[in-house]
Curated annotation (Swiss-Prot):
It comes from the Viruses. It comes from Avian infectious bursal disease virus (strain Chicken/Cuba/Soroa/1998) (IBDV). It is found in: Virion. One of its GO terms (biological process) is viral genome replication. This is RNA-directed RNA polymerase. RNA-dependent RNA polymerase which is found both free and covalently attached to the genomic RNA. May also contain guanylyl and methyl transferase activities. Interacts with VP3 in the cytoplasm. Residues 398-598 form the RdRp catalytic domain. Keywords: Covalent protein-RNA linkage, GTP-binding, Nucleotide-binding, Nucleotidyltransferase, Phosphoprotein, RNA-directed RNA polymerase, Transferase, Viral RNA replication, Virion. Its EC number is 2.7.7.48. GO terms for cellular component: virion component. Residues 846-879 are annotated as: Disordered. GTP binds at G259, L260, P261, Y262, V263, G264, R265, T266. It is an enzyme of class 2 (transferase).
Length: 879
C-alpha cells in the first residue's frame, strides 16, 4: 500500500476519479491527503482581552469572590459515619481530607486546555492511515461506482474541513454571548407560572412524556430521601469478618472534574471531600429549618448567611467540550460544559438518579408515551419507531430532552431547542424537581422525602445551577439559563420540550413549518429550530425495502454497494433495511459516521492510558465499533476498518499482550460504548454478530408509580385546559409545596390541606381513596398559595448566593498571565485575610477537631470563628 499513489496507473485513476489535476512537480498524494492544519491564534487568550470582549457584548462579569485555602483534616474525624471504610482493602477514602477552612483566602482560577493550538497543531491528528487504506481499496475495484467514490470523498472532506479538539477561548466566549441572546433576546425566557402553568399541571404533562417509577427495584427498595450522603452507604456485618455494603449513592463519573474548590482534580480524587461538604450543607440547612429559618427576623438572616458561605456551590468551571468542529468556525464556536462543583452534583444526583435510572419507560413499552428516554435503536428499537412512523394516524410526536420529532402530513420533522439549556429558568427546574419528588419519591402518595430535601430541591438546587455563575481564567461571570451538564440537565430540557408539545396540542397541532407553530416561541419564551424535514417519509421508508443491497444483513456477505438510508436524525441515527431480518435497522447518520471515522478521539480514560499496548487495543476497538454502528453498510469503510483492526490485533498478539483483557474494557475505549450498554457484544463484526445485535427482543417492562393515561399528551393537555383531569398525586404534591418553602407561616393553609388529605386515607391499602380528591382546578387553587411561596423563597436563595458579587460590570485588575496554556491548575495566589463569609470555613470541624489554640484562636478569620461557634452550639444541643 506504500506505493498506492506512485504508479502511473494509480495517479491517473485517482486524478480522474476525484478531479485532481496536479501541475508539474506536484504529487497526487499531496493534493488528496490534507496537510497538518495549524489553528489560528486565539485572540482572547488572556483575562483582560476575554473580559473586554464580554463587556463589549453586554455580558456580565462579576466581582470575584474568594475562597479559603484548603487544609488537611483526618477523614475519620470529619466522616465518622464512614470510619469503617478506611478498614476495607482498596478503600476509596484517603486518610485525610482537604477542606476549605484556611485562614487565608484566594481568588480561584481555572485555565482550560485548548487543543489543538498554534503551538501544538497535531494534538488530535486525523486518521490518514484509514484514508490511505480506503484509497488503496478503491483502486482495487476495476469499475468503482459513485457510491465508493463518495465514501473516499466524504472522508477526505471531513479531514480537510473539520478538526477534533476543544476549541478556543474566543469560541467559548461567543457561545456565552449566544446563550445570553437566546435567554434575553428575541424571545426572552418566561417563568411557566406566569403563563398559567402550575407545578402540578406541568407534572401532569410529564406523567405522559416522562413517566417515572419509584427508586430502587422490587427486590431492593431504595432508602427514603431523608439522609445525608455518608449515611447512604450502609454496612451490614463486621469489616473483620463477613460484611456487606448497601450503596444508595448515585452513579457518578469519578474521572470527571471535581470543580470548585478543587480545580484540577477529579471527583474520584475528592470523593471524601464531596461527601463531607454535602453532609455539612444539608445538616446546617436542616438545623436552620428546625429553628424556623425563613420566617422574618434573625432566623431568616441565618439561612441567607449560611447560603452565602457556600457561594462556590453555584459556580461551575467553564469547560470547553471536545468535539469535531468545523475549521472555518474554530474561533467562533466552542460548546461549553458547566462543570458543577462536586457537592452540588452529588446532592442533585441523589434526587434525580435513583428515580431516572430505574425508569426505563418510553414509546416502546408504554402506549401513548412519546418519550425516547433510555431508547436504544438496536434489538428492534429503531424498527418499532419506523413502524410507528408508517402507521397512518397523525399528527404525532416523540420527545427526548431538547429534541422533538413530529410526523405531520406525511412529513418527518426533526426539531431542536435552540441552545436548549439557555431557555431554562429557575422556575422550570423547580417544576422538574417537584415532578421527581412527587412522582418518583412517592410511596402510594406518601412522600419519601423530608423537609430538608424538599427545601433543597425546590428552593436551593435551582439557584445553584440555573442563572448562576461560572469560572474561566480568573474571571467569574454570569451564566444564562442552566449550566450544561448539571445533574438535572436532561429533565429540565425534557420539560421545556414537553411545554412546546403541550402548546402544539392546544393549537390543534399545526404543521411545524407554519407561522402558527413558530408563535409558540414567543408564547413560552422557548426558542427552537427545524433541523431536518423529510417529505413523503412513508414512501421513502418503504423504498428502503425494495432497494436493499446484498450485505451482512441481506445475504450474509460483505457489501459491494451500500444500501440506501433515510437520515431521520433520530438521536443521530438513520434507518436502512435488512432482508435477512425483515426489519429496519439503525446506522449512524452518514455525516456523523464519516466524521467520527476521520478524527479519532484517542484514549480518553486516564487510568487506561498508561497501559502498555493500549494504543493498539484502542485501534481494534475503534475500527470494530465504527463497523458496528453503521460502517458495515459502506463497502470501503467497512473493509478498511476490518483490515486496520486485523493489523492491530496481529500486532498485539505478536507482542504477547492480553488482547482479551483489553477488549473486556472496550466500552471504556469507544465513544459509542454507551449505545451497547447492557449488551453482550463480541467485538468482531460478522453477519452473525450483527444479526444478534439487531434481532428484535421484547422491550423492558415499564416501571411506573401509577398507570399512564393511554390517551396520550393531547388528551391530558385538553383535560388540563378544562380542569377535568383528576389528580392522583395530590397528597405528595401538597406536602411538598407545604414543606419546600422558607417562610413557614405563609404555607400554613397549604399544609393544612395536605394533612387533611393524609388523614382521609383509609387503612385499607387497596381502597381507592383518590376518588375523594377534588378536580384538578380545585386542587391547584389550594396549592397556589404554596407555589407562590416556593417561588419567593427561590428568589431569596438566589440573592443570597449572589450577595458577594457586584451588580455592575467588573474590570479585572489582575496581572496578565503571559501564557494561559501553561498556567497550572489550580493557581492559588493573591492571598488576603478572610474578611467575609466565603466558603465552608470551620463548619466541618463540628464533626472532628479544632485548632490547637481553640476555635477562637487569634489567627482564625472572623468568619471561621463564627462558623466554629455555630458547630459548637449544634454539638452541645445534640448532647
Amino acid at each position: 500500500m506504500s506505493d498506492v499513489f506512485n504508479s502511473p496507473q494509480a495517479r491517473s485513476t485517482i486524478s480522474a476519479a476525484f478531479g485532481i489535476k496536479p501541475t508539474a512537480g506536484q504529487d497526487v498524494e499531496e493534493l488528496l491527503i490534507p496537510k497538518v492544519w495549524v489553528p489560528p491564534e486565539d485572540p482572547l487568550a488572556s483575562p483582560s482581552r476575554l473580559a473586554k470582549f464580554l463587556r463589549e457584548n453586554g455580558y456580565k462579569v462579576l466581582q470575584p469572590r474568594s475562597l479559603p485555602e484548603n487544609e488537611e483534616y483526618e477523614t475519620d474525624q470529619i466522616l465518622p459515619d464512614l470510619a469503617w471504610m478506611r478498614q476495607i482493602e482498596g478503600a476509596v477514602l484517603k486518610p485525610t481530607l482537604s477542606l476549605p477552612i484556611g485562614d487565608q483566602e484566594y481568588f480561584p482560577k481555572y485555565y482550560p486546555t485548548h487543543r489543538p493550538s498554534k503551538e501544538k497543531p497535531n494534538a488530535y491528528p486525523p486518521d490518514i492511515a484509514l484514508l490511505k487504506q480506503m484509497i488503496y481499496l478503491f483502486l482495487q475495484v476495476p469499475e468503482a461506482n459513485e457510491g465508493l467514490k463518495d465514501e473516499v470523498t466524504l472522508l477526505t472532506q471531513n479531514i480537510r474541513d473539520k478538526a477534533y479538539g476543544s476549541g478556543t477561548y474566543m469560541g467559548q466566549a461567543n457561545r456565552l454571548v449566544a446563550m445570553k441572546e437566546v435567554a434575553t433576546g428575541r424571545n426572552p425566557n418566561k417563568d411557566p407560572l406566569k403563563l398559567g402553568y402550575t407545578f402540578e399541571s406541568i407534572a401532569q404533562l410529564l406523567d405522559i412524556t416522562l413517566p417515572v417509577g419509584p427508586p430502587g427495584e422490587d427486590d431492593k427498595p431504595w432508602v427514603p430521601l431523608t439522609r445525608v450522603p455518608s449515611r447512604m452507604l450502609v454496612l451490614t456485618g463486621d469489616v473483620d469478618g463477613d460484611f456487606e455494603v448497601e450503596d444508595y449513592l448515585p452513579k457518578i463519573n469519578l474521572k470527571s472534574s471535581s470543580g470548585l474548590p478543587y480545580v484540577g482534580r477529579t471527583k474520584g480524587e475528592t470523593i471524601g471531600e464531596m461527601i463531607a461538604i454535602s453532609n455539612q450543607f444539608l445538616r446546617e440547612l436542616s438545623t436552620l429549618l428546625k429553628q424556623g429559618a425563613g420566617t422574618k427576623g434573625s432566623n431568616k438572616k441565618k439561612l441567607l448567611s449560611m447560603l452565602s458561605d457556600y457561594w462556590y456551590l453555584s459556580c461551575g468551571l467553564l469547560f470547553p467540550k471536545a468535539e469535531r468542529y468545523d475549521k472555518s468556525t474554530w474561533l467562533t464556536k466552542t460548546r461549553n460544559i458547566w462543570s458543577a462543583p462536586s457537592p452540588t452534583h452529588l446532592m442533585i444526583s441523589m434526587i434525580t438518579w435513583p428515580v431516572m435510572s430505574n425508569s426505563p419507560n418510553n414509546v416502546l413499552n408504554i402506549e401513548g408515551c412519546p418519550s425516547l428516554y433510555k431508547f436504544n435503536p438496536f434489538r428492534g428499537g429503531l424498527n418499532r419507531i419506523v413502524e410507528w412512523i408508517l402507521a397512518p394516524e397523525e399528527p404525532k410526536a416523540l420527545v427526548y430532552a431538547d429534541n422533538i420529532y413530529i410526523v405531520h402530513s406525511n412529513t418527518w420533522y426533526s426539531i431542536d431547542l435552540e441552545k436548549g439549556e439557555a431557555n431554562c429558568t429557575r422556575q422550570h427546574m423547580q417544576a422538574a424537581m417537584y415532578y421527581i419528588l412527587t412522582r418518583g419519591w412517592s410511596d402510594n402518595g406518601d412522600p419519601m422525602f423530608n423537609q430538608t430535601w424538599a427545601t433543597f430541591a425546590m428552593n436551593i438546587a435551582p439557584a445553584l445551577v440555573v442563572d448562576s455563575s461560572c469560572l474561566i481564567m480568573n474571571l467569574q461571570i454570569k451564566t444564562y439559563g442552566q449550566g450544561s451538564g448539571n445533574a438535572a440537565t436532561f429533565i429540565n430540557n425534557h420539560l421545556l420540550s414537553t411545554l412546546v408539545l403541550d402548546q402544539w396540542n392546544l393549537m390543534r397541532q399545526p404543521r411545524p413549518d407554519s407561522e402558527e407553530f413558530k408563535s409558540i416561541e414567543d408564547k413560552l419564551g422557548i426558542n427552537f429550530k427545524i433541523e431536518r424535514s423529510i417529505d413523503d417519509i412513508r414512501g421513502k421508508l418503504r423504498q428502503l425495502v425494495l432497494l436493499a443491497q446484498p450485505g451482512y444483513l441481506s445475504g450474509g456477505v460483505e457489501p459491494e454497494q451500500s444500501s440506501p438510508t433515510v437520515e431521520l436524525d433520530l438521536l443521530g441515527w438513520s434507518a436502512t433495511y435488512s432482508k435477512d431480518l425483515g426489519i429496519y435497522v439503525p446506522v449512524l447518520d452518514k455525516e456523523r459516521l464519516f466524521c467520527s471515522a476521520a478524527y479519532p478521539k484517542g484514549v480518553e480514560n486516564k487510568s487506561l492510558k498508561s497501559k502498555v499496548g493500549i494504543e493498539q487495543a484502542y485501534k481494534v476497538v475503534r475500527y470494530e465499533a465504527l463497523r458496528l454502528v453503521g460502517g458495515w453498510n459502506y463497502p470501503l469503510l467497512n473493509k478498511a476498518c476490518k483490515n486496520n483492526a486485523g493489523a492491530a490485533r496481529r500486532h498485539l498478539e505478536a507482542k504477547g499482550f492480553p488482547l482479551d483483557e483489553f477488549l473486556a474494557e472496550w466500552s471504556e475505549l469507544s465513544e459509542f460504548g454507551e449505545a451497547f450498554e447492557g449488551f453482550n457484544i463480541k467485538l468482531t463484526v460478522t453477519s452473525e454478530s450483527l444479526a444478534e445485535l439487531n434481532k428484535p427482543v421484547p422491550p423492558k417492562p415499564p416501571n411506573v408509580n401509577r398507570p399512564v393515561n393511554t390517551g396520550g399528551l393531547k388528551a391530558v393537555s385538553n383535560a388540563l385546559k378544562t380542569g377535568r383531569y383528576r389528580n392522583e398525586a395530590g397528597l405528595s404534591g401538597l406536602v411538598l409545596l407545604a414543606t419546600a418553602r422558607s417562610r413557614l407561616q405563609d404555607a400554613v393553609k397549604a399544609k393544612a390541606e395536605a394533612e387533611k388529605l393524609h388523614k382521609s386515607k383509609p387503612d385499607d391499602p387497596d381502597a381507592d381513596w383518590f376518588e375523594r380528591s377534588e378536580t384538578l382546578s380545585d386542587l391547584l387553587e389550594k396549592a397556589d398559595i404554596a407555589s407562590k411561596v416556593a417561588h419567593s423563597a427561590l428568589v431569596e436563595t438566589s440573592d443570597a448566593l449572589e450577595a458577594v458579587q457586584s451588580t455592575s460590570v467588573y474590570t479585572p485588575k489582575y496581572p496578565e498571565v503571559k501564557n494561559p496554556q501553561t498556567a497550572s491548575n489550580p493557581v492559588v495566589g493573591l492571598h488576603l485575610p478572610a474578611k467575609r463569609a466565603t466558603g465552608v470555613q470551620a463548619a466541618l470541624l463540628g464533626a472532628g477537631t479544632s485548632r490547637p489554640m481553640g476555635m477562637e484562636a487569634p489567627t482564625r478569620s472572623k468568619n471561621a470563628v463564627k462558623m466554629a461557634k455555630r458547630r459548637q452550639r449544634q454539638k452541645e444541643s445534640r448532647q
